């Protein structure tokens, strides 16, 4: 069973700086307002080396145009995304939906990344702090130890319920 890649806080596609993949036939640089400077800097670096195309987006209102641009590319195109988290996730998802692999995408996230935990008690997903090791489920209020494993199917790190020290008495009453 194949599960499509998803963008998460530790994805291999997330980089601090774009790296030109000169073996590719063309580059497509997609950025939102937040990622404009990163994209501009990268474009000045690659100008004259490989053909490229740029797309500036404003979020969901550009969804159809993003889809059109991605679908119109030939094999061998490398995609670069410089955007805030929500826009980066949207563009990444559209790319994967169109058939791109993680190797064909590099993403620079501008601003904070989002991290999600999948509760093994109520089977819901909650947003958690980026470096949190323990969290409380937003849905059932269970205390969760955040495991190291990210579930592509559940789109979150696995959260294992536990009873925190001091609450054992309440539970046993």
Feature annotation, model-predicted:
Residues 1-115:
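FNR/FR-type flavoprotein reductase catalytic core
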Residues 93-173:
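Cys/His-clustered metal-coordination modules, chiefly Zn-binding fingers
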């Amino acid at each position: 069973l194949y599960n499509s890649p998803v963008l998460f806080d530790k994805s291999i596609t997330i980089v601090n700086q774009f790296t030109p993949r000169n073996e590719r036939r063309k580059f497509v640089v997609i950025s939102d307002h937040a990622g404009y400077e990163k994209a501009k800097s990268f474009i000045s670096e690659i100008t004259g080396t490989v053909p490229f195309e740029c797309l500036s987006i404003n979020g969901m209102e550009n969804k159809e145009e993003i889809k059109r641009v991605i679908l119109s590319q030939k094999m061998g195109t490398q995609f670069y995304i410089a955007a805030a988290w929500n826009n980066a996730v949207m563009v990444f998802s559209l790319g994967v939906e169109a058939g791109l692999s993680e190797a064909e995408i590099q993403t620079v996230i501008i601003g904070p990344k989002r991290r999600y935990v999948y509760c093994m008690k109520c089977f819901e997903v909650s947003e958690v702090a980026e470096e949190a090791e323990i969290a409380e489920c937003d849905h059932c209020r269970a205390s969760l130890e955040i495991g190291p494993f990210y579930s592509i199917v559940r789109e979150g790190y696995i959260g294992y319920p536990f009873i925190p020290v001091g609450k054992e008495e309440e539970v046993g009453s």
